[in-house]
Amino acid sequence: MTLLSVHNLRAYYRTKAYGISRNVRAVDGVSFDLYPNEIYGVAGESSCGKTTLIKVISGNIKPPLKALEGSVNYNFDGYKVDMLHISEDELRRNVRWKQISYVMQGSMSVLNPVRKVLKTFEDIVDTHERITDKKAFLEQMRIHINRLGLPTEVLNAYPHQLSGGMRQRVAIALATVFQPALIIADEPTTALDVVVQRGVLHMIKNIQAMSHNTVLLVTHDMAVHANVADRVMIMYAGRIAEEAPTESIFNAPLHPYTQHLINSLPVIGKKSTKASLKGSPPNLADPPSGCRFHPRCPYVMDECRTVVPELITVKERHRVACHLVKEGSL
């Protein structure tokens, strides 16, 4: 049974510059499935469409962003949601936080600087379930954060009194207060030192193991995916380049872009300079024809410049969009 099924999703930003209107094709024909009880990673360079994708699948579709085509369907144990056609009222009352929660990039974006952490918990919970017994609520929140490894004192603190790592842990605790079926984490380790990153990732893994929910982890850091994710999707210029179990992505990458991402990771004991990828990501308001990676690809063929490669299944749970793979050249 799938938790989320995304089919042929196209989500564009409508922009206007110098009197000319145009579409920025941030997500362009994306299809994938999420299953219960897994950690699914989404990786790629800045401006590849990662954040736009999670905006759409979480129902945060506001101008200038518009979903033009495709479907985003959830199945929460029989409660089915069509995210592209759900009303804002139903989304707020029945889906956000209760079924889908969102750990935003940068914990200070979530926490109100003039309210104590407990008050922020109250604001979220009271939106869905009327708090009638404050003492019982306090005890429930104490148990919740202690279970996640946070001290009780955090509840009585203001955000500025906490370290960056502690604030990020609080943001994750807020996202899990209703034990939702899907947790979307957008760059949860950004701006944290490596020791704190390890603690945050350990917390995410523990939550998923305890609650058996699904985590959609979005980060450009391939090392994070290597340590946490069960499956990884590689995005490039608004499209899926490759999707596979984490072990396959790292040990047998098929797409040239995925190969570059893996080869760019530092290796302990080796001091050689890593080869950089020529060029820059394309302008999504005027993307190149054919495969969008072809201007930077070291293996480019004539077909790559004119024909969009299909996302094909090469073996179980391993999909790739590359003419070279189809031809058996990689």
Model segments located where?
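ABC transporter nucleotide-binding domains
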Residues: 1-251, 320, 326-330
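Short catalytic/signature loops enriched in Gly
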Residues: 80, 243-330
